[in-house]
């Protein structure tokens, strides 16, 4: 009797999700995974292979099950590392512990070339923006930021002034699910730059525009139980009236194109994202 109950329950479960799968409209994009989902395959030699991908992508309540998996892994089994993404205090971190010396040298060579070619007798400043791993207290592999800073400081042209920004930021300055910093947290950074560069102080934008949900680049790589972020972009009359020229698309655009909030990466709201 017990085996029959288990068998019937399993069959009922499969039938229920088959019916739900037929009734639900297919999704084109997963914003949580930041990718296009498989569509129903055409009838050809690859039909059954593509059908497997389609059924997996269009499974009912897929996002909810991913969230349950993330909760089970992170909370129940205490697994903080997955696909090189580390979870701590509701933040996701991309672990990267190696400094690419060749890349640093290449950067320094480019800076020296630009300095010698285009910036003669100009005031030049350099800042290294730390990623949010710098503010991660846990003992996990991460960049030797002191060594990286030393490599840059000791090899930059002597006429370039270094502006240290590390103490103007904190972990709270970054998104939970993404590598980027939050625009609304950057006033201390702006004030430091203005002070060191002898620029006139300006009013920091105060009009907050919010968009939710924002699933960052790191969220797409792991099944996480962490809640989505809220993107906040700041405006004032000057920003609203300003335009920018997109050299890649060869067109004039507003500072914020709200249509980009509906992109797979909503962070594209900031100067058209990677296109700019």
Predicted regions and their residues:
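Extracellular glycan-modifying ectodomains
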Residues: 1-276
